[in-house]
Amino acid sequence: MKRGEIVENPGYHVREIPKGVIGESSKILEEVLELQDAEDQNALIMALVELSDMVGAIELYLEHRHPTVTIEDLLIMSHITQRAFKNGRRT
């Protein structure tokens, strides 16, 4: 993915990052782009904050798009996927 243009008078982020819509995948993408910008700046704490913001954006996406699914449900599936990759098999 192409990184945004460098902004003239930066705040936290030195690249232009389009604003997403709360509850939509565009907000998750915004947080990913902010994470990448933090990494480009070698800003460890900022990167961790962006990861936290990403979790929040995912929770709001679920509330908006899949109200019966929780972040815990996603974590269960994530752990199962990790197990499958670790063991080298999907069946």
Feature-to-residue mapping (PLM):
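Flexible "arm" and connector segments at domain edges
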Residues: 1-91
